[in-house]
C-alpha cells in the first residue's frame, strides 16, 4: 500500500489507467498501516492493519466496503493499558509547505505532563501512524508522557519534491 501523509492506506489501482483509489480500511478516523492485502472471491479483501494505537490484526473489507476485524490477538495485553488520545496536527513549515505530526497523550491527565519529542531517522523516512516494536509512541504515552512526532521536510509520504527538499541540506529546511 502506498504511503499517504502518516498512513499506509488500503488502495486499489486500475491496471489500465493507473488511477489509484483509497479504500476505507478501518472503523477508526485514520487507517493506519495496511499491508498484506489479498483479494477474496466475491470482491472482498483480506489484509493486516496496525496503527499507533494498536498492533497488527487481520481485517476483511467486503465488496460493499464494510470493514470487519477478524482477529484481536493482543486484546489481553492492550486491555492492561490506560487509554490515550491520538490526534494529528498540521502547520506551515519551511517554504510554507504543510508539515504533519501526531500527538499522543494520556486521557485527562491530572496535572501537566512531560513531553517526549520522538523523531524518525533517515532523514528521508516517516514516523507514520503505525505500531513499532522499536520506538513506540503509544507505549511512551502509557508512561504518562505527551508524545509529539513531526514528519519534517525530507519525510516520505508527501510527494517526491517534499522528500527531496532536504537533499544536501538536512538541518536547513526541517
Where are the regions that the model predicts?
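Conserved catalytic/ligand-binding micro-motifs in nucleotide and anionic cofactor chemistry
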Residues: 10-12
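Blade-edge beta-strand/turn elements of extracellular beta-propeller
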Residues: 18-26
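Short, solvent-exposed loop/turn segments at conserved positions within beta-propeller repeat blades
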Residues: 2-8, 51-54
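Short loop/turn segments that connect beta-strands within beta-propeller blades
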Residues: 14-18, 62-65
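Generic N-terminal initiation segments characterized by hydrophobic and/or small/turn-forming residues
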Residues: 7, 20, 42-43
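Serine-hydrolase catalytic core recognition
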Residues: 25, 29-174
Amino acid at each position: 500500500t502506498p504511503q499517504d501523509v502518516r498512513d499506509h492506506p488500503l488502495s486499489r489501482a486500475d491496471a489500465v489507467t493507473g488511477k489509484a483509489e483509497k479504500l476505507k480500511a478501518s472503523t477508526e478516523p485514520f487507517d493506519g498501516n495496511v499491508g498484506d492485502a489479498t483479494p477474496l472471491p466475491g470482491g472482498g479483501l483480506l489484509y493486516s492493519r496496525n496503527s499507533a494505537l494498536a498492533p497488527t490484526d487481520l481485517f476483511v473489507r467486503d465488496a460493499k466496503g464494510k470493514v470487519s476485524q477478524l482477529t484481536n490477538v493482543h486484546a489481553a495485553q492492550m486491555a492492561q493499558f490506560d487509554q490515550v488520545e491520538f490526534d494529528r496536527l498540521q502547520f506551515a513549515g519551511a517554504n510554507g509547505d504543510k508539515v504533519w505530526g501526531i500527538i499522543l497523550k494520556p486521557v485527562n491527565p491530572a496535572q501537566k505532563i512531560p513531553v517526549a519529542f520522538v523523531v524518525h531517522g533517515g532523514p528521508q523516512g516517516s514516523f507514520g501512524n503505525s505500531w513499532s516494536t522499536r520506538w513506540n509512541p503509544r507505549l511512551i504515552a502509557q508512561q504518562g508522557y505527551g508524545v509529539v512526532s513531526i514528519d519534517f521536510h525530507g519525510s516520505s509520504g508527501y510527494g517526491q519534491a517534499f522528500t527531496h527538499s532536504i537533499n544536501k541540506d538536512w538541518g536547513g529546511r526541517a
